[in-house]
């Protein structure tokens, strides 16, 4: 996404539609972000300027990419927010980030992605800071988002339960190195790398312990 500080060293290529994103200027990357590449962050509170109401962020983003009027932006966002179960869109847009729950902020980011219609959505640990009920609801919204838009999604997560529910293919990394890549079914049923087997076995052990506890209650 080109959001790292200039002094952070990066190497390699990131190819998107035949173009190396690492070679683009900030001005060129700014055009890609939002329209082509959209990122949904782990902490919704950090995704929005705390000194501005939510609507300011949404209007600035959509006006920059589409040149829409405030009225058109409100209409577009109202429809998108209702589709992710957020009612009273105008009221929400007039609130500050700290006045909304983590789950609501995640849904606002998903609604914004619906309006932007990017080619790729990068979701970085989007359910980590949420309670179990909010996690379930947000994952369902991600699945609907992918189905509705037909876009590609890179979903970064340590939660294998969420990964199993939302992913088609899994890429396992350890210390920044790719150690295994395969379909969801193969990774969970026949993991090849020792580290992947460790992750999957721990997940199964937790699930079995939970089932045993529930059976005793």
Which residue stretches match the model-derived regions?
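A short, proline-enriched helix->beta-strand linker immediately N-terminal to the Walker B motif
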Residues: 115-119
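A short, surface-exposed alpha-helical micro-motif characterized by mixed small hydrophobic
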Residues: 163-165
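Short catalytic/signature loops enriched in Gly
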Residues: 87-93, 181-217
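Conserved ABC ATPase "signature" region
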Residues: 20, 72-91, 201
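Conserved ABC transporter NBD signature motif
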Residues: 9-20
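Helical segment within the ABC ATPase nucleotide-binding domain
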Residues: 136-149, 161
């Amino acid at each position: 996404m080109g959001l790292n500080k200039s002094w952070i060293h990066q190497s390699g290529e990131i190819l998107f539609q035949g173009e190396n994103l690492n070679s683009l200027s900030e001005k060129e990357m700014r055009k890609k972000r939002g329209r082509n590449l959209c990122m949904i962050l782990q902490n919704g509170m950090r995704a929005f300027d705390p000194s501005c109401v939510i609507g300011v962020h949404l209007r600035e983003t959509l006006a920059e990419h589409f040149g829409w009027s405030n009225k058109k932006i409100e209409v577009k966002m109202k429809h998108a927010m209702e589709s992710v179960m957020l009612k009273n869109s105008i009221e929400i847009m007039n609130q500050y980030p700290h006045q909304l729950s983590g789950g609501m902020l995640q849904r606002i980011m998903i609604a914004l992605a619906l309006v932007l219609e990017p080619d790729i959505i990068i979701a970085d640990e989007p359910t980590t800071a949420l309670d179990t009920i909010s996690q379930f609801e947000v994952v369902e919204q991600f699945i609907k988002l992918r189905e509705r838009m037909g876009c590609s999604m890179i979903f970064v997560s340590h939660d294998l339960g969420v990964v199993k529910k939302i992913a088609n293919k899994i890429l396992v990394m350890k210390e920044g190195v790719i150690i295994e890549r395969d379909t969801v079914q193969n990774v969970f049923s026949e993991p090849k790398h020792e580290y992947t087997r460790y992750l999957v076995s721990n997940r199964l052990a937790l699930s079995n312990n939970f089932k045993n506890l529930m059976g005793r209650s």
